[in-house]
Amino acid sequence: MRVILSGGGTGGHIYPALALAEVIKQHEPDAEFLYVGSERGVEANIVPKTGMAFKQLAVQGFSRSLSLHNIKTVQLFLKAVKVSKKIIKEFKPDVVIGTGGYVAGAVVYAAQRMNIPTVIHEQNSVAGVTNKFLARGATKIGVAFEVAKQQFPSEKVVLVGNPRAQQVAQLKSTFSWQTIGLRDDKATVLIFGGSQGAPAINLAVIDAIPEFNERSYQVVIVTGPKRYDNVLDLLRERNIEAADNIRILPYIDNMPNVLKQTDAIVSRAGATSIAEITALGIPSILIPSLHVTGDHQTKNAQSLVDVGAAINITESDLNGQSLIAAVDTLLLDENVSDKMAAQATKVGMPDAGERLYQLILQAMANKKD
């Protein structure tokens, strides 16, 4: 089996593709992969480290206003399609899979023009621009949220979940809180604003630390590497010291390992976070980012709130007191946390990679028919 994967720009498009590749390898050890990414996206740093063959295309997104930028965007897209056709001709894939981002638009569109089976995967509750564009020509479409199905042709779309969920669920964690000086027998909340950190979350945490110091549970705060020094500076300016039950870290290398030992999480509501949280059945406090296309994080969060699997705090309502109140609700009331964990588990799809793999086989079978 020969597979071209394409997705780029953010980790939310890349990690599901890499997780899917792991599942395919489990079924087909001789499978060969080629990942086609963008020159500017983070995939250029992430994919080569996995040992997967990697090629780059020059693409860029559209501006909301009419401009010369958009003319160049179209020119780059057409050139990227031409280069993609050459790559496809040389690699001879059985299927081409797109997981979002502008680069996937060029690669999957080229494959569609060459009559090669294509599968696209939508991680969010609101379909992205690229996947909307590719939907008509796609052989099959997998989505991570039930609500996303209505945005695609009904005869093609299947609810499969996010392959990242299966990757996390299958992981055997050896992590201990003792490695950062905490105890394994105490309830622990992880507060994480994403790989770059979230200033709004960090500021709320700073306000909350004096009260967190008095709690029986443990608090692990991940600031983001670029914001770590700023958080420490603000704590010093305000004469706030963190007690022994609190740890402040710039980043965590292996988040899935840590999540398996976490009793509650405070995070943004990105697709990857939602997949991980539900796969592991972790009660969560979600603070959707306002700076995303189509406000999809709010809708992602609402999908968990609606089934009682999460608490949602809007950024405008986020402060030290609202954060403490929400964490107390999860970690000081076992009935609440147990119910939320059960509901998160119900909506989680720990076999998402397997579901998407089966959809890919269907797409390939359609071609043979």
Swiss-Prot record:
GO cellular component: plasma membrane
Signal peptide bounds: none
Membrane topology (UniProt): Peripheral membrane protein
Residue pairs linked by disulfide bridges in the UniProt entry: none
Subcellular location: Cell membrane
UniProt pathway: Cell wall biogenesis; peptidoglycan biosynthesis
Name of the top EC class for this enzyme: transferase
Catalytic activity, EC: 2.4.1.227
One Gene Ontology MF term: undecaprenyldiphospho-muramoylpentapeptide beta-N-acetylglucosaminyltransferase activity
CDD domains: GT28_MurG
SUPFAM superfamilies the UniProt entry points to: UDP-Glycosyltransferase/glycogen phosphorylase
GO BP annotation list: carbohydrate metabolic process; cell division; cell wall organization; lipid glycosylation; peptidoglycan biosynthetic process; regulation of cell shape
Reactions it catalyzes: Mur2Ac(oyl-L-Ala-gamma-D-Glu-L-Lys-D-Ala-D-Ala)-di-trans,octa-cis-undecaprenyl diphosphate + UDP-N-acetyl-alpha-D-glucosamine = beta-D-GlcNAc-(1->4)-Mur2Ac(oyl-L-Ala-gamma-D-Glu-L-Lys-D-Ala-D-Ala)-di-trans,octa-cis-undecaprenyl diphosphate + UDP + H(+)
Purpose of the protein: Cell wall formation. Catalyzes the transfer of a GlcNAc subunit on undecaprenyl-pyrophosphoryl-MurNAc-pentapeptide (lipid intermediate I) to form undecaprenyl-pyrophosphoryl-MurNAc-(pentapeptide)GlcNAc (lipid intermediate II).
Protein name: UDP-N-acetylglucosamine--N-acetylmuramyl-(pentapeptide) pyrophosphoryl-undecaprenol N-acetylglucosamine transferase
Native species: Leuconostoc citreum (strain KM20)
Upper classification of the organism: Bacteria, Bacillati, Bacillota, Bacilli, Lactobacillales
